[in-house]
């Protein structure tokens, strides 16, 4: 990038200096802080601290310390004023003495330099030759000689005032209704946001000790808080899920030591997982740990332990005594061998179905790859433990008498299941027909669920985009922003409100002075008057409060969501309608019609058209005829006006390691006065030296013999209106209409919006519409999933065929997948959750889970038939014999997801669709396994009723 930038510099207009921004992503703003002073605090000279003083402390005390924090690539500053030394000439004195602003700037720059002149050697020593010429204070600047008139030196202080002054700033910061200085810590791309934010907060506390008494620096926004809340949610889900799994194991196994062995797989598998994550550089966060289910992790161990307990009981009954140690070892090996193949294949299938998730790319790939890696690591660890630790632990620790009969709970379940199984086998056709109807019905229902990319994460805080009419001054915007903050901070749920207005020092996020980003930081819910108040209700109250303040338009979103939307589509809203064409007026007219139509679509909020016009301008138009008469060119007029209004840097003043620009410009009162600008003296030196000035022109204006000419003789000054901004995309002009979506799924909203605009808005020839926003990622991911999901199903069937060596049996077990998916669809519909990528990942995971129980049952039925049992009896005994492992694996797998499905903590929104799909799917899959799968097996093998 730097190399390409150097190549195009020659094509960029003079005065523009392109620079690379921070090496960071759009989500790199992880930590913000404010510098403020107690109104009673005083400096050493007894004066109060000003905004310039606070900015100086930020630039030269705080910022250098924070930039040394590992992982920080930039500390961006907004607010206050950079200190400058202002030389403000009096135009009347300049005209009287024949000087221009450029003359003053050139004289100061020429008298403010240090020069090195090599070195000399004397007496064996080397002396560097140094010629100091820099000014040390304001007095020395004032004493710089501009020229001599009749032997009398003319100093800078003779024509100008020299004093400290503020910069012409392009941005400001406010907090709780008053101005502050704000710093933003930008994280280096690839760094860990939590680590960097914590290190920045610690360094900020150290920086506080180096500040004067009465000046405080406080954190305003720390992403660590959100990260910690989401990690706490994940940790709580995992702990609660583990406890539920362990309770179920105790209840259904009826053996304390067996349950402990199974439960021991959880920490061992987690150790395996965390080791792999550490080696792979994957951090523990909401996405990486969000799909971990301890129920799935112990499924393989459950199958092995349950079969060992059953075999131990049968062997004890046959022997009439407890088994010896050697007999127990032999029985463990035999029982494990009996089920190790289906259990390993089951875990292998669950693991394999996560592999196609790696085919996701873009934003969805970044989000879900860590999740897939973590689950694959956990299940791989579980398979290793099922092969090694579990059989060894059973053989060693399950000594003594093992209960031969089922516990009361399982006996009660068996009594209820036997008549249901008998009914299912008698009414096999009806059961299969009912399953088919359910699959078709849920397929139709899925098309009505709506869709979104991923559920919005409730960050806890609110970001508000406040916009005024183009041309609103920074001073006016600050006043309006103070009123907004004073109104918002009165809410008892609000902790503080701070804003960034306009563009900061490093223009990584440029905004005009009429626009502000407002961050509304909320108190913890426990401190709210009503902790159960819905977020949507509070958002409506905030919106109603600020709508009462005139002159503003608002967009409400969240801090991270705002940046994510910008990264995805270039706008901060959920949906962007981009209109492309040539003429700005036509674009604006059609854009307003689109906005009017979009506002009528249910779910639309904060609909607005990008402001492209209405920027007030003071235009100085050079008169080329007059310029030619004086032998001047437009560049000299442009240079004079630029120096007078914008200022010209004429060197720097050094105070220790601090340096401040010396700027030549008009006094503030004259800068604001067009009449004073018209009287600016423009130098005629170049024309006089060239000798090509038109004497008649000079005589007509009374400037014969003069060294300068007033600007009014060379140009006209007039107020006008120009475009506020001209945006292009792929080389074509475009205007954007944005909208947020409230209380509706994103996919359904965009679909209706497209239909409504296509029906009600006539787009002129040569103009066209494109749609942008986070739904683009939904479309991209959906297209990828349309390939990934069939591939997943093919992998499942291939593994089943490998396990059984029979297409029939593989098809029987595979039939569990569609019925499991129906349960997921019904669960989403019951909870009002739209389809999303999170739900899609849940369906992928469910495809693997759905075949596990069928694999175990069909394997047992096949072994019974191989043992000589007739088909009907083998099917019945196989279903009853595998009732406990089927229920156990289903219960532990689903209960492990229950905390994710019903938790309301930070980040639970992302986990909820995935968990809901898996729980609903496991319920329907279990019903299939216990009632429909025996029917399918008997029906497909009816022509081969003899033992296999």
Feature map (PLM): residue ranges:
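Transmembrane alpha-helices and their membrane-interface boundaries in multi-pass membrane transporters
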Residues: 16, 279, 294-309, 340-359, ...
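C-terminal transmembrane helical bundles of large multi-pass transporters
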Residues: 168, 223, 227, 260, ...
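Membrane-proximal extracytoplasmic
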Residues: 1-242, 252, 321, 366, ...
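Extracytoplasmic/periplasmic
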Residues: 2-11, 15-19, 52-81, 103, ...
């Amino acid at each position: 990038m730097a190399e390409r930038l150097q190549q195009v510099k020659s094509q960029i207009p003079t005065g523009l200096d392109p620079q690379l921004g921070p090496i960071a992503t759009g989500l790199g703003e992880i930590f913000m802080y404010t510098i403020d002073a107690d109104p009673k605090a005083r400096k050493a000279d007894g004066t109060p601290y000003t905004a310039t003083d606070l900015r100086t402390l930020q630039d030269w005390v705080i910022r250098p310390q924070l930039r040394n924090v590992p992982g920080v690539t930039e500390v961006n500053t907004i607010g206050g004023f950079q200190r400058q030394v202002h030389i403000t000439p009096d135009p009347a004195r300049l005209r009287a003495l024949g000087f221009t602003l450029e003359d003053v700037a050139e004289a100061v720059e020429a008298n403010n330099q240090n020069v090195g002149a090599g070195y000399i050697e004397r007496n064996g020593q080397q002396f560097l030759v140094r010629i100091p010429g820099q000014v040390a204070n304001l007095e020395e600047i004032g004493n710089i000689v501009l020229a001599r008139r009749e032997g009398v030196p003319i100093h800078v202080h003779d024509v100008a005032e020299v004093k400290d002054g503020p910069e012409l700033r392009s941005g400001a910061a406010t907090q709780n209704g008053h101005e502050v200085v704000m710093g933003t810590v930008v994280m280096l791309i690839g760094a860990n946001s939590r680590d960097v934010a914590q290190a920045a907060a610690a360094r900020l506390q150290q920086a506080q000790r180096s500040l004067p008494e009465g000046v405080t620096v406080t954190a305003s926004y720390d992403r660590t808080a959100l990260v910690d809340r989401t990690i706490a949610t994940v940790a709580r889900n995992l702990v609660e899920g583990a406890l539920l799994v362990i309770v179920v194991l105790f209840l259904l196994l009826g053996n304390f030591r067996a349950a402990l062995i199974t439960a021991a797989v959880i920490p061992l598998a987690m150790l395996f997982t965390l080791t792999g994550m550490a080696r792979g550089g994957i951090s523990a966060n909401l996405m990486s740990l969000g799909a971990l289910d301890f129920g799935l992790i112990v499924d393989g161990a459950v199958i092995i332990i349950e079969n060992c307990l059953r075999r131990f009981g049968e062997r004890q009954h046959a022997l009439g005594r407890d088994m010896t140690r050697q007999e127990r070892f032999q029985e463990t090996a035999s029982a494990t061998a009996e089920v190790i193949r289906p259990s390993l294949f089951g875990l292998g299938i669950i693991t394999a179905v996560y592999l196609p998730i790696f085919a996701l790319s873009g934003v969805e790939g970044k989000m879900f790859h860590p999740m897939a890696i973590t689950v694959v690591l956990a299940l791989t660890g579980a398979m290793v433990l099922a092969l090694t630790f579990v059989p060894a632990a059973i053989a060693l620790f399950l000594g003594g008498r093992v209960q031969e009969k089922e516990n009361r709970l399982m006996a009660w379940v068996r009594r209820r299941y036997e008549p249901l199984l008998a009914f299912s086998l008698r009414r096999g056709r009806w059961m299969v027909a009912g399953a088919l109807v359910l699959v078709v019905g849920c397929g139709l229902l899925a098309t009505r669920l709506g869709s979104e990319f991923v559920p919005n994460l409730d960050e806890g805080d609110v970001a508000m985009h406040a916009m005024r009419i183009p041309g609103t001054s920074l001073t006016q915007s600050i006043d309006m922003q103070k009123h907004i903050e004073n109104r918002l901070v009165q809410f008892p749920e609000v902790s503080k409100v701070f804003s960034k207005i306009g563009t900061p020092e490093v223009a990584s996020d440029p905004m005009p002075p009429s626009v502000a980003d407002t961050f509304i930081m909320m108190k913890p819910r426990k401190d709210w008057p009503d902790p159960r108040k819905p977020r949507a209700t509070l958002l409506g109250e905030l919106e109603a409060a600020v709508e009462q303040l005139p002159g503003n338009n608002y967009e409400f979103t969240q801090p991270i969501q705002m940046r994510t939307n910008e990264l995805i589509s270039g706008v901060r809203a959920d949906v962007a309608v981009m209109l492309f064409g040539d003429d700005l007026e036509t674009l604006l007219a059609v854009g307003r019609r689109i906005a009017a139509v979009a506002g009528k679509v249910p779910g639309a909020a904060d609909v607005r058209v990008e402001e492209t016009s209405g920027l007030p301008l003071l235009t100085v138009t050079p008169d080329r005829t007059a310029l030619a008469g004086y032998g001047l060119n437009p560049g000299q007029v442009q240079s004079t006006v630029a120096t007078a209004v914008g200022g010209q840097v004429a060197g720097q003043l050094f105070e220790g390691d601090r340096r401040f620009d010396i700027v030549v410009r008009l006094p503030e009162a004259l800068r604001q006065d067009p009449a004073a600008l018209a009287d600016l003296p423009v130098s005629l030196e170049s024309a006089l030296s060239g000798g090509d000035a038109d004497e008649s022109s000079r005589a007509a204006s009374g400037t014969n013999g003069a060294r300068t000419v007033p600007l009014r003789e060379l140009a006209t000054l007039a107020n006008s209106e120009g475009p506020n901004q001209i945006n292009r995309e792929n080389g074509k002009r475009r205007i954007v209409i944005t909208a947020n979506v409230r209380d509706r799924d994103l996919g359904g909203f965009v679909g209706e919006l497209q239909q409504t605009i296509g029906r009600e808005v006539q787009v002129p020839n040569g103009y066209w519409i494109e749609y942008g926003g986070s739904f683009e990622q939904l479309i991209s991911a959906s297209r990828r999933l349309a390939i990934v999901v069939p591939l997943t199903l093919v992998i499942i069937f291939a593994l089943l065929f490998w396990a059984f060596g029979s297409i029939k049996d593989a098809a029987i077990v595979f039939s569990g997948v569609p019925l499991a998916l129906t349960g997921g669809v019904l669960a989403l519909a019951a909870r009002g959750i739209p389809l999303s990528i999170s739900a899609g990942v849940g369906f992928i995971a469910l495809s693997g889970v759905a075949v596990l129980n069928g694999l175990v049952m069909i394997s047992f039925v096949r072994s019974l038939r191989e043992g000589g049992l007739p088909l009907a009896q083998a099917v019945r005994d196989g279903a009853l014999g595998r009732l406990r492992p089927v229920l156990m694996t289903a219960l532990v797998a689903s209960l492990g997801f229950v905390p994710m499905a019903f938790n309301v903590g930070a980040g639970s929104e992302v986990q909820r669709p995935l968990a809901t799909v898996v729980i609903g799917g496991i319920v329907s899959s279990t019903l299939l396994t216990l009632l429909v799968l025996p029917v399918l097996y008997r029906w497909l093998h009816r022509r081969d009723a003899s033992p296999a």
